[in-house]
From Swiss-Prot:
Pfam family name, one: PDGF
InterPro entries assigned to the protein according to its UniProt record, in alphabetical order: CXCXC_repeat (IPR004153), Cystine-knot_cytokine (IPR029034), PD_growth_factor_CS (IPR023581), PDGF/VEGF_dom (IPR000072), PDGF/VEGF_growth_factor (IPR050507)
Keyword annotations from UniProtKB, A to Z: Angiogenesis, Cleavage on pair of basic residues, Developmental protein, Differentiation, Disulfide bond, Glycoprotein, Growth factor, Mitogen, Repeat, Secreted, Signal
Protein name: Vascular endothelial growth factor C
Annotated S-S bridges: 127-169, 158-205, 162-207
Amino acid sequence: MHLLCFLSLACSLLAAALIPGPREAPATVAAFESGLGFSEAEPDGGEVKGFEGKDLEEQLRSVSSVDELMSVLYPDYWKMYKCQLRKGGWQQPSLNMRTGDTVKLAAAHYNTEILKSIDNEWRKTQCMPREVCIDVGKEFGAATNTFFKPPCVSVYRCGGCCNSEGLQCMNTSTGYLSKTLFEITVPLSQGPKPVTISFANHTSCRCMSKLDVYRQVHSIIRRSLPATLPQCQAANKTCPANYVWNNYMCQCLAQQDFIFYSNVEDDSSNGFHDVCGPNKELDEDTCQCVCKGGLRPSSCGPHKELDRDSCQCVCKNKLFLNSCGANREFDENTCQCVCKRTCPRNQPLNPGKCACECTENTQKCFLKGKKFHHQTCSCYRRPCTNRLKHCDPGLSFSEEVCRCVPSYWKRPHLN
């Protein structure tokens, strides 16, 4: 319940700060970051977090600073805001943030004094060793006729709030301090006696789980947070020029003040947007939206270039799809014209010329003692017209030269 009240108060304070303020000096910004405990090495926020019932409730209950709270609710916008702080301030937003090279944010929703005040108060109440005064007699259970002077001593004990109701602040390490006091016993039989007593001194603390005994006997019905941020029950109002109705804050807001909430006409199912779009992420060094995964123009390979809007590698010559010529088609994978011609078996395809060519030719057939047949792309041998029936001993008839030749000249007849 306290968390809901805090969120309502935070939203009211943020809405009250919609009037853009002056630019703060870099020194002031640096001091603010230091107060919030920001570091240059920011952990990766990952994808836009889904606002689903129990998961959201657990995250909200476990946050321990303004930085963590904003990172849970508005991960990308908050990262962009801190990036702008490190760059020396913020700028007025561009209404079309995804198309510009540099995403500019408005300062209206981020009143530094309010956030700093909340975070300072938050840090003061964290679970940690705190200097307290303890009653010596009660600490050790002294007899009623014995007391100490001074009656109290100063030691450190764990105290503060845990960020979840199921936890309590407990000490994880303890040291002991020796204190010298006067011990007085009545009736007085002797004067005050100096005594040295050791007191437990907590040196480190941690929020730890409570025992579940009571919860097993008495179930506590708690009202859960809604699965999504509450929508306004009232109908959308007609807002003046340059103002847009906001379903979450239930009022008209200036367009330039939209920083936590996206344009109503472009709401997604969960009501939140990635500030850089689905294919981009924030580069915290340059405060610009860049393609995810470190995709650069050099990553696309030959014949391709990087489309900075879609963050995809596209063909450089895609505008010339119809210039491939006959029997060629444009291949989207290689970004080149490839031959798609079908050739007969005896005329294999020449990919370079995209033509069906014969494997045999006149010269090849001549070397085989044959003639070239253009229609069939094959070599053939014309029959001998003067074939001799008998050759002299040691000679054999050659079908290639149509005469008798020495037998050892004759090659095996391949055909």
